[in-house]
Each structure stands twice: as structure tokens, then as C-alpha cells.
């Protein structure tokens, strides 16, 4: 789903988490907030999630990178866009977004509740969810070194809940420490993994909007 704004605009691609969808309240609110501020916003479902085709059991880091690359390719043929794009990724969506940015010209990123080591947090995810995935997910995940991929990467904002029950805040700090300026770090007190409470969520959206304006909109 492409939310357009008035005039030519940079795009913010929203990448949802491992078992989430593009229609989560979080991403609907992000699109609603960003579009009037000079951004086109894209929401999409990774394969096997929400309205997409495929089976969640076939999900891997590699498959999600391929899905994201397909979205970027699609946008390159759309009119009314500047060609510059940012990524706002939540949890596994942030992980995938960072890996994509390591090999592609992403202008800026904001990653929420994002792990630096997917395998280390698997035990914190509900067992019923993890059982939906094949062994291939874990084999594929071992191929990727997120901290190595983002070492020296600029223009990334890291947001994390201090009460995240899935991804320890220390993983967010490790990501931030690996980055290069300009970068930003925001720890949200009392916020959970989904940043589900109204006040922290509003704070996160406001902070991300300000970050993307600074990085992508001249004069802001």
C-alpha cells in the first residue's frame, strides 16, 4: 500500500516484524502521521504474512531481503517519488532493513526494537510462533552478521523499549555503537517490545518523523 503526499516526495518503507503484518495499528499510525509531513509511505506484507501469498513456514532472512528488494524495485517505476528512500523497521523488520542498507543506497533508517542477534532471542519468542518456522530459518540466520554488516553505517536511528520482553535493550546499544554518525539512540522507559502503549508509541513516531525529516527533507 502506497500512501502518497502532495508533490514529489522521498519514500519511507515500513518493514514489519517476524509474525506481524503491514496492517498493525503501529504502521497505520505511522503512515497517517508521515504522509502529511512530506513523505510517501509504503506498507507491505512479507511473504506468508497478512495479505501476501506464501507460507510463513518458508520465511528466512534471505527471503525477507528478497521481498524488500522487490518492493524497492517496484517503487523505482512509480512516478511522483524522488528516488530516495528510508526504512522504518520494527523488530525483525529492522534487522532485515539494516542488512538491506548494508548493500543498497538507503538514505536513512529508523529501527525499533531490533535485535543484533536473531538466534539469541529465539527463546524469548512464544514457542507456538517459533514452531511455525522450518529449520531452514535458523540455518539461514547463521549466515548473517548484523553487527559486522552495519559497522560504520551512517544515518541510522535506534529506538528501543527499556521493558522489551523479547529483545534486550543491550542489543540496541550494540547496534548503535557499531554505527557511524549521524546516528541517534532513544531508549523509551516502560515501553514493551511492540511499543504498544500510547505514550511511548507517540514518542517513537514523533522521534522517527523528526529523524527522517532531518535526513531526507532539505531545510528541516
Say what each PLM segment does.
Residues 58-79:
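Alpha/beta-hydrolase active-site loop
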Residues 99-139:
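Hydrolase active-site cap/lid region
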Residues 19-31, 46, 170:
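The serine-hydrolase catalytic nucleophile loop
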Amino acid at each position: 500500500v502506497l500512501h502518497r503526499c502532495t508533490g514529489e516526495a522521498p519514500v519511507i518503507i515500513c518493514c514489519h516484524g517476524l509474525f506481524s503484518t503491514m496492517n498493525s495499528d503501529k504502521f497505520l499510525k505511522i503512515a497517517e502521521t508521515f504522509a502529511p509531513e512530506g513523505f510517501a509511505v509504503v506498507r507491505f506484507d512479507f511473504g506468508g504474512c497478512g495479505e501476501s501469498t506464501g507460507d510463513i513456514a518458508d520465511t528466512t532472512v534471505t527471503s525477507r531481503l528478497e521481498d524488500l528488494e522487490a518492493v524497492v524495485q517496484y517503487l523505482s517505476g512509480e512516478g511522483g517519488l524522488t528516488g530516495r528512500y528510508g526504512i522504518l523497521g520494527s523488530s525483525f523488520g529492522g534487522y532485515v532493513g539494516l542488512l538491506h542498507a548494508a548493500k543498497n543506497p538507503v538514505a536513512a533508517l529508523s529501527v525499533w526494537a531490533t535485535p543484533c542477534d536473531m538466534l539469541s532471542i529465539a527463546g524469548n519468542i512464544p514457542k507456538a510462533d517459533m514452531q511455525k518456522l522450518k529449520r531452514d530459518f535458523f540455518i539461514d540466520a547463521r549466515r548473517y552478521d548484523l553487527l559486522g554488516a552495519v559497522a560504520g553505517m551512517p544515518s541510522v536511528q535506534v529506538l528501543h523499549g527499556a521493558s522489551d520482553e523479547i529483545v534486550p535493550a543491550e542489543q540496541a546499544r550494540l547496534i548503535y555503537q557499531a554505527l557511524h554518525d549521524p546516528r541517534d539512540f532513544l531508549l523509551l522507559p516502560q515501553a514493551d517490545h511492540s511499543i504498544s502503549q500510547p505514550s511511548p508509541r507517540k514518542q517513537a513516531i514523533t522521534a522517527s518523523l523528526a529523524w527522517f525529516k532531518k535526513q531526507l527533507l532539505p531545510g528541516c
